[in-house]
Design a protein with these regions (language model features):
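Ribonuclease/tRNase effector modules and their secretory precursors
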Residues: 1-92
Length: 92
């Protein structure tokens, strides 16, 4: 179901301490919070943003459909989506 560039996966492991394997496991085990259209469809037509929960923090995983597979492009933590979906930083 998922595919990715192994070089990018190694870079994510080194720089962000997360892997596409872990992301796929999280998605398959119910950790997917939302799927959004990429806000810049002109530059990234058809690309989606998968919002996932990693240890209580929202991560954004840009992805695109390739046939019957989903290509994971990168992953990064997002304060904006953590606040929106997980309520971190709420004073109430």
């Amino acid at each position: 179901m998922f595919e990715w560039d192994e070089g990018k996966n190694n870079k994510l492991k080194r720089e962000r301490k997360v892997s596409f394997e872990k992301i796929a496991r999280i998605i398959n085990s119910g950790g997917l919070i939302d799927i959004l259209d990429h806000p810049n469809q002109k530059k990234y037509p058809g690309q989606k943003l998968l919002i996932i929960n990693i240890n209580g923090y929202a991560w954004v995983v840009p992805a695109e459909r390739r046939g019957n597979r989903l290509r994971l492009i990168t992953a990064y933590p997002s304060r904006k989506y953590t606040k929106r979906y997980l309520g971190a930083g709420d004073e109430s």
